[in-house]
């Protein structure tokens, strides 16, 4: 299971959700879904990480690592 820090990170960076969506090339509705905990495709996750100048693993964290 993935835990998303996307909303917190975007808020901390002072960015508008629509700005991030436009830079990534996704619809605002898709961005809203991701902000509410939806899972992105790998390509979208990579693009978001690039826009935020972060690694994908810093935005979406695997919660079940202890059971692997």
Located regions from the model:
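Residue-level signal for the short linker/turn that defines the boundary of a DNA-recognition helix
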Residues: 4, 14-15, 40-43
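Short, basic-rich loop-to-helix N-cap that marks the start of a DNA-contacting helix
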Residues: 37-50
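Short, charged recognition helix plus adjacent turn
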Residues: 8-9, 13, 22, 33, ...
């Amino acid at each position: 299971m993935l835990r998303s820090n996307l909303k917190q990170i975007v808020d901390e960076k002072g960015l508008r959700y629509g700005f991030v969506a436009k830079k990534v090339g996704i619809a605002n509705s898709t961005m809203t879904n991701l902000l509410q905990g939806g899972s992105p495709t790998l390509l979208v996750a990579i693009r978001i990480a690039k826009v935020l100048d972060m690694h994908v693993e810093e935005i979406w964290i695997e919660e079940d690592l202890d059971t692997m």
